[in-house]
Amino acid sequence: MKIKLTDQAVEWFKDELDLPENNKVLQFYVRYGGEFQLKQGFSPAFRVEPREDVEIGYEENYNDLILVVSEEDLWYFEDNEVLVEKVDHDDEIAYSKLK
């Protein structure tokens, strides 16, 4: 399992979500529906949470931007590599599967 953020995506998250912030993490989680689906019927989403509110199952540090996935959402991301990048023309985030 791996969630890879491009440098542009890291900067986007920092600018749009005011991260890094004291004891806050960027949490990727699973939601019902959505366009990009690793597993049918579900897609990734993100939110900012206090670190102590997340039972962390996966963690990456991107230049002080802490990305986490909770234990309960590991089933969705396991056995996959996901690339998260910024789409310049839309100023949005896009997901793609690497493996």
Swiss-Prot record:
InterPro entries: HesB-like_dom_sf (IPR035903), PdhI-like (IPR008326). It comes from the Bacteria. Belongs to the HesB/IscA family. This is Uncharacterized protein SH1556. It comes from Staphylococcus haemolyticus (strain JCSC1435).
